[in-house]
Amino acid sequence: MAGHSDNDLGLPSFDKPVKVAIVIAPYYTSISEAQLAAARGVLDAADVAHETIEVPGSLEVPTAIGIAHRMSNFDGFVALGCVIRGATSHYDVVVNESSRALTMLGLQGICIGNGIITVETRDQAEERADGGRLNTAGGAAEAALHLIALTRSYGAPKGALGFKPRGTIEIADGSSQA
């Protein structure tokens, strides 16, 4: 995720339309509203089409992204939510597992900006959700756009990994086997 930094890459430009899904766990309403406004602002500024998908909690964000990636035509995703430490170890599970799952999806080539806020206090969450302050959601939207631009700069995928259909096996000498 892009965040508060002195390094401003600016927004990438695209020669073909881009479609992004904002996947958010709106557990804390006021924080979620600020996150959505910030992410949408960045995507609108880049003239990028976007849709919003709501899920119950931050643990469901990666699953929703995986489903949407397989079942739709989104070029990238912005993961949003907020996890504030409580009195139990549940915070650690949610923070670690949602981050791990988003990273695993990213390593599979899915363009994701991670804007899930993980903090100790509500004040810290509000500071990070504020589009005029730390703006983690806007930074996540920018990160997703930069990953989409990077992916497009390399052209079409080189091909799928896995088994070829029966009858398409190629032998080293150039012949094929049915």
UniProtKB/Swiss-Prot annotation:
Keywords from UniProt, A to Z, are: Riboflavin biosynthesis, Transferase
- Which of this chain's residues are annotated to bind (2S)-2-hydroxy-3-oxobutyl phosphate? A87, T88, R128
Pathway involvement? Cofactor biosynthesis; riboflavin biosynthesis; riboflavin from 2-hydroxy-3-oxobutyl phosphate and 5-amino-6-(D-ribitylamino)uracil: step 1/2
Q: Any keyword Transferase?
A: yes
Cross-referenced InterPro entries: LS (IPR034964), LS/RS (IPR002180), LS/RS_sf (IPR036467)
Catalysed reaction, written as an equation: (2S)-2-hydroxy-3-oxobutyl phosphate + 5-amino-6-(D-ribitylamino)uracil = 6,7-dimethyl-8-(1-D-ribityl)lumazine + phosphate + 2 H2O + H(+)
One Gene Ontology term of the biological-process aspect is:
riboflavin biosynthetic process
GO CC term, one of those recorded: cytosol
Q: Which family is annotated?
A: Belongs to the DMRL synthase family.
User: HAMAP family this protein is in?
Assistant: Lumazine_synth (MF_00178)
- Show the PANTHER family listed in the entry: 6,7-DIMETHYL-8-RIBITYLLUMAZINE SYNTHASE, 6,7-DIMETHYL-8-RIBITYLLUMAZINE SYNTHASE DMRL SYNTHASE LUMAZINE SYNTHASE
Function noted in UniProt: Catalyzes the formation of 6,7-dimethyl-8-ribityllumazine by condensation of 5-amino-6-(D-ribitylamino)uracil with 3,4-dihydroxy-2-butanone 4-phosphate. This is the penultimate step in the biosynthesis of riboflavin.
Protein name, UniProt field = 6,7-dimethyl-8-ribityllumazine synthase
